Amino acid sequence: MKSLLNRIILCSAFLAVASGLSFTVTSRIYMDVKHNKKPVGRITFGLFGKLAPKTVANFRHICLRGINGTSYVGSRFHRVVDRFLVQGGDIVNGDGTGSISIYGDYFPDEDKALAVEHNRPGYLGMANRGPDTNGCQFYVTTVGAKWLDGKHTVFGKVLEGMDTIYAIEDVKTDTDDFPVEPVVISNCGEIPTEQFEFYPDDFNILGWIKAAGLPVTSSFCVLLIFHYFFRQLNMYC
């Protein structure tokens, strides 16, 4: 009985992994954030370098080296929309009107990255003004935002620090979604890492097995009880 139960759970787990979406994280970037000069926390992004190599290269370069002497350090989160996203990275003008990249003012979308669905919080994507207008600005979703699907290059996801993202989301803004008090990237850098497969936050196979174990076991116990009583009835019929 125990062997059969284990096989069912393992088989279900295998099917879940086979059908589950995963991303190859090729590098990790962190950003430290301050609100009105007070530390808020750190965000750690896992970047999808195989899915969006050009976009990841641009983002990493701006973080680590900058363009024309300017990196993301000191730049603001200039757009904060509750229950939607936080947006930053305008290292040109600081207000969402500027654009620059290692490829020029703009660079094209990457088709595979356009196909990623914004079905949960924490996705890192390129802000744009339309197709093929990627530059330096990026956003992080705070909810599932399916209306962005197919319109933006998704190139990473928050691995740690969603509490920091939500803290940014909670700051007071004006009527143009611009924070009243500055929300600034005070530091950023790279965390050495070997590439690994990353499953979205709500897909946790170990947690699924733990969660499934008790219900499946309970179901089998109920079936065994019914089976026992049916056998007893047959003995007296």
Swiss-Prot record:
Signal peptide: 1-20
Gene3D superfamilies in alphabetical order: Cyclophilin-like
InterPro entries: Cyclophilin-like_dom_sf, Cyclophilin-type_PPIase_CS, Cyclophilin-type_PPIase_dom
Membrane spanning stretches: 205-225
Record keywords: Glycoprotein, Isomerase, Membrane, Rotamase, Sensory transduction, Signal, Transmembrane, Transmembrane helix, Vision
Glycosylation sites (chain numbering): 68
Tissues/organs with expression: Expressed specifically in photoreceptor cells.
Entry's localization field: Membrane
Catalyzed reaction equations: [protein]-peptidylproline (omega=180) = [protein]-peptidylproline (omega=0)
GO molecular-function term, one example from the UniProt record: cyclosporin A binding
All copies of domain PPIase cyclophilin-type, residue ranges: 30-190
Gene Ontology biological process: 'de novo' protein folding; intrinsic apoptotic signaling pathway in response to endoplasmic reticulum stress; N-glycan processing; protein folding; rhodopsin biosynthetic process; visual perception
UniProt GO cellular component terms: cytoplasm; cytoplasmic vesicle; endoplasmic reticulum lumen; endoplasmic reticulum membrane; intracellular membrane-bounded organelle; membrane
EC number(s) per entry: 5.2.1.8
Topology relative to the membrane: Single-pass membrane protein
Predominant place of localization: membrane
Family: Belongs to the cyclophilin-type PPIase family.
Entry function: PPIases accelerate the folding of proteins. It catalyzes the cis-trans isomerization of proline imidic peptide bonds in oligopeptides. Acts on the folding of rhodopsin RH1 and RH2 (but not RH3) and is required for visual transduction.
Protein name: Peptidyl-prolyl cis-trans isomerase, rhodopsin-specific isozyme
